[in-house]
Amino acid sequence: MDEPRVREATERDAEAIHALAVELAVALGDSPPTPDNVRARLAELLEEPRAWVLVAEGEGVVGAASLWVKPDLAHGDAVAEVPMLVVREERRREGVGKLLMEEVQRLAAENDANLIELVAATQNAQAREFYRSLGFVETDHVALEFVGDVDDPPDPDED
C-alpha cells in the first residue's frame, strides 16, 4: 500500500472528491451532493485566494479536506475554518487524516490564522477522538445547524 501524500486538489479530482463527499453525507444523514455541484463548488474554491481543497493520494484519492481563512469579528482575528475532512472508510486509522490536518495547520499558520475551527457531530465519537488526539479541544459551545432554502425561505408564521 502506497504511503499517502497530500497535495492541493485540481479540477481533475472532482470525481474522487464527489465520492468522498457522498460518503461523508451518508454518514451524517445528509443528502449527498450531485457530481455537478461538487465540480462547480470545487472550481469556485480553487479560484478563492484564501481557500484550499486538499487531497490525500495513496492508490488513488483516499481523503480530502477543505479550508478557508477568513476574518472573524467574533474572535477579532483570522480564523481557519475546516468545513470538510473525510477519509475513505477502508483507509481510516492509517494516518491519512493526520496528514491532511498537518497541511491544514501549515496553511492556517502561513496565512496568519490564530485559530482553527472545525465541527464533528456529537454522535461521531471516532471523529471527536481523532481531533482530540491532534490536540484540538472540544468547547462548551453547543451548535445547532439551521437551514433554510434561499429561493423559498421558511415562513416564520408557519409551524
What is each PLM-predicted segment?
Residues 19-43:
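Conserved GNAT-fold acetyl-CoA-binding loop/helix
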Residues 43-55, 81:
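A short helix-loop-beta-strand connector motif used in the catalytic cores of GNAT acetyltransferases and
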